[in-house]
């Protein structure tokens, strides 16, 4: 039997001398700012690795997409079924300025709308806003029973469905093409388009639960900082401090210090 070192005993554990590095030590937190169309402007924070060499932190943040519930943006629990997508467009200091990048409904809300004895009608249209955004709007609506109707069901005929769908497309196209993205988003929140469709189609067949259920941005115009600042409106004013009057005691102390120095 050969006498010598037992390599297995003398060797320590592999990788035991490795230092544990905190992954957050090389990262920074940035505040996410929502457009001025929403009530709550500061919606949260996001992480990004610090600037190292050619890797710039602000470039890593741009075009990140955040999904936020409209209930949090408006401080209104009744709007919890809408999900708003916001895309990071620019970084100013520790603030990430975002813009609208789409909207959708929660699955449970959509499932709760579908019921028996009624007809579901859907429509979609591609439309361009005045500021150059190409959007695809999806609309959903349901038939309802006429006043004093005895019959349980309220199914619409195929010809009526076609007429209603035509009206949906027409109203969505008119509403979206006549305004910019900021104005259009302000129409989605109180469901202006859905109410107009209900009113316009009442002569064909009465509708209920008419919503623009989804908005997709297909194409965005070239980035313009001026337009982004317009969308954020009073963002610049928020960071400006207000002038405070100096207390009389502090003024007296300051006078004594000046006298002592002389």
UniProtKB/Swiss-Prot annotation:
Can you tell me which family this protein belongs to?
Belongs to the eukaryotic ribosomal protein eS1 family.
* GO CC terms, sorted: cytosol; cytosolic small ribosomal subunit
Keywords linked to the UniProt accession: Cytoplasm, Ribonucleoprotein, Ribosomal protein
Describe the protein's quaternary organization and the partners it interacts with.
Component of the small ribosomal subunit. Mature ribosomes consist of a small (40S) and a large (60S) subunit. The 40S subunit contains about 33 different proteins and 1 molecule of RNA (18S). The 60S subunit contains about 49 different proteins and 3 molecules of RNA (25S, 5.8S and 5S).
Q: Which PANTHER family match?
A: 40S RIBOSOMAL PROTEIN S3A
HAMAP family assigned: Ribosomal_eS1_euk (MF_03122)
Q: Which InterPro entries match?
A: Ribosomal_eS1 (IPR001593), Ribosomal_eS1_CS (IPR018281), Ribosomal_eS1_euk (IPR027500)
Q: Where in the cell is it found?
A: Cytoplasm
Q: Where is this region: Disordered?
A: 1-20
Q: Where is the composition biased (Basic residues)?
A: 1-18
- GO MF term list: structural constituent of ribosome
Disulfide pairs here are: none
- Which is an annotated Pfam family here? Ribosomal_S3Ae
Taxonomically, the superkingdom here is Eukaryota
Entry's Gene Ontology BP terms = translation
**Record keyword NADP present:** no
Q: What is this protein called?
A: Small ribosomal subunit protein eS1
